[in-house]
Amino acid sequence: MKLQYLVALLFVQAVPPVTAGYIHQYALAGSAIRQPIDQKTQREDLNKLVSDSPLLSLHRTICEIESVSNHEGAVGEMLIKYLRDHDFTVEKQIVPADRGTNSTAERFNIWAYPKGFPRPKIILTSHIDTVPPHIKYSLHAPDGDFDRAKVRIMGRGTVDAKASVAAQIIAALKHLKSNKDIPLGLLFVVSEEVGGSGMVHFSNSELNTNPPFFHTLIFGEPTDLTLVDGHKGNLRVTIHAKGVAAHSGYPWLGHSAISEILPILARMDELGDIPVETGGLPSSEKYGRTTVNIGTIKGGAADNVVPETASASISVRLAAGTPEEAEEVIRRAVNDVSGGSTNITVNFPDSMPYPPIDLDVDVEGFDISTVNYGTDIPKLEIHDEELEVKVKRYLYGPGTIFVAHGAEEGITVGDLEKAVEGYSKLIDAAVERDWPREVVVN
């Protein structure tokens, strides 16, 4: 055995098992051997990867800025500067703080369009708020052989929905670079995560004309790069029970509100599994079962006191029918269980419940899916009732909803870059679409 081969063999045997953190590869004696790099070098390599990409660097910048709902002002200001630096005309839509919050900070929707096109026909839109808490942006190399596309970006908003925001902007810039006359607009709204007041504000504004000046809306949410043909409807329910407080040693002297509400909640929990014919909530082939989630239960003062009050909040994801029909089913179910007790009160606090939302999927080259989560799509009223050709609504975006809102929220570089291609494809289809009318906006 040649001496140099023996040395190489001994070196290979001494190398520790492959772990994350090995990016560079070198050849020795015909064998590929990974050489470890220290964390500082790896961090510098990953940061350079991001800094060299307009998409990744924009995504990093907006994700590093905390923008929990009702505190979106800082990220909004950053986006306004970025868009103006790239020759967009940008308008602020000041949105008041949501009811019940203590925030006094200014926050706003962002309405942007190429100079000279204040009424764009194609609008890309997403939201700039996130759920709490803010989680710091971080980069993570893949295990095993280094693959740029598998580098993982983690932190709050990296998926929901700042990935869509960044990809939509870069896709728009790409198209405007090749054709500055493409009528593209950008709408980024606040408070999607807490009721959709940002989109409601836009919907009620003079920008939402009748008839609409736009013919295509492209909404950005995490869809795993699939084109979504619809999502379930939504209805919120609160149930309150009233009792009489007493010493727990003498419970017959009082009346337990918790005992009153428990059988009602048990019935609510199964309404999605009961056939409509026997009092259940509807299902559909497209969306499956209507689902009921009892999200919070509150009640009682102490374990040695008969509880005087109890309440529960419930989210219903509708697979079919209307919110009004679902409300009737729920009222009947509560009445059946409680025997019409006046101690029970049912409320439907959402001012804008909505049925299942069907969306457009007529662009080729995408996998198709349905989703169970809600969006602010139904919060935008489109005044196309009198039009022969209706406004197209698409829902598409990078990342998976399964990690959104969680401690492990994150997305790969590959998925983020593919999203630019996907949005570009949707823009191309919108540009090519025949729009057989001239819209006159007063």
Swiss-Prot record:
Its main location: secreted. Disulfide bonds: none annotated. It is an enzyme of class 3 (hydrolase). Its EC number is 3.4.17.-. Transmembrane segments: none annotated. Residues 1-20 form the signal peptide. It is found in: Secreted. The active site is at E192 (proton acceptor). GO terms for cellular component: extracellular region. Zn(2+) 1 binds at D160, E193. It holds the Pfam family Peptidase_M20. GO terms for biological process: proteolysis. Glycans are attached at N102, N343. SUPFAM superfamilies: Bacterial exopeptidase dimerisation domain (SSF55031), Zn-dependent exopeptidases (SSF53187). One of its GO terms (molecular function) is peptidase activity. Keywords: Glycoprotein, Hydrolase, Metal-binding, Protease, Secreted, Signal, Zinc. Its cofactor is Zn(2+). Zn(2+) 2 binds at D160. Belongs to the peptidase M20A family. This is Probable carboxypeptidase PAAG_00768. It comes from Paracoccidioides lutzii (strain ATCC MYA-826 / Pb01) (Paracoccidioides brasiliensis). The lineage of its organism: Eukaryota, Fungi, Dikarya, Ascomycota, Pezizomycotina.
